[in-house]
Amino acid sequence: MSAMNIAVLVPVKKLDKAKMRMADTLDRSQRRQLMMVTLRRVLSALQKAQIGDVYLVASDPQVKNIACDLCVKFIPDQGDELNPSLELARGELCQNYDALLVVFGDLPMISDKDIKTIVRLGSSKPSCVIAPDKRNVGTNVLFLHPPYLLPFTFGGNSYERFRSNCEKLGVQFLVYQSQNTALDLDYPQDILDLAALRGHKISGLEEILDPGVLAQISQVTSMSGAKMGA
């Protein structure tokens, strides 16, 4: 699709530590299942887009198995901190690439069309393209052309940090707004939003998207909201 030589990094936490904000509504097994299914969906979209070489950055053996199953390259993650891990991966790879795409593995609705559009938006050099979360606070997808354009500053309020760094450097900053890329699965409410958008038809998530489970999640989120408002 693209004349650019692109590296794609998909960072993944250890599955036992994933989605801890949902611990009050989903048990450990359900959280692992949620992460594995959404990760496979993200990797499938990336493979269908055919925009570059895909690398999973992780330390979990089960994630490595997914990489093997889908013929995706695997980079062992040597640390627990996201930004240093990504910097190490970029340092190992990106001297051989024209651009870098970072996609998180908890985007159940992302499509190959979304990925192609983001790359197309960032085709001029230098440029940074961000797909923010639905709160316009975090960053779910980041495209850098060239790969070393900006330091990684993922974490709370990363959207504003990337924007500010682009402004300081005089770099083109572009935003891709899409329901598909905005919905990440960090909070119990995100499960309810996914069910509202897609019903109960995501293969592998039938148990989590069961109406009974959704009712329990809705009750917990309502109680949490009431406590915050009290």
Curated annotation (Swiss-Prot):
GO terms for molecular function: GTP binding; phospholactate guanylyltransferase activity. It catalyses: phosphoenolpyruvate + GTP + H(+) = enolpyruvoyl-2-diphospho-5'-guanosine + diphosphate. GO terms for biological process: F420-0 metabolic process. Keywords: GTP-binding, Nucleotide-binding, Nucleotidyltransferase, Transferase. Pathway: Cofactor biosynthesis; coenzyme F420 biosynthesis. It comes from the Bacteria. Phosphoenolpyruvate binds at residues 139, 155, 158. The keyword Nucleotide-binding applies. Guanylyltransferase that catalyzes the activation of phosphoenolpyruvate (PEP) as enolpyruvoyl-2-diphospho-5'-guanosine, via the condensation of PEP with GTP. It is involved in the biosynthesis of coenzyme F420, a hydride carrier cofactor. Belongs to the CofC family. PANTHER family: 2-PHOSPHO-L-LACTATE GUANYLYLTRANSFERASE. The exact nature of the substrate is currently not known. This entry has been annotated based on its similarity to Actinobacteria. This is Phosphoenolpyruvate guanylyltransferase. It comes from Thermobaculum terrenum (strain ATCC BAA-798 / CCMEE 7001 / YNP1). The lineage of its organism: Bacteria, Bacillati, Chloroflexota, Chloroflexia, Candidatus Thermobaculales. The gene is fbiD.
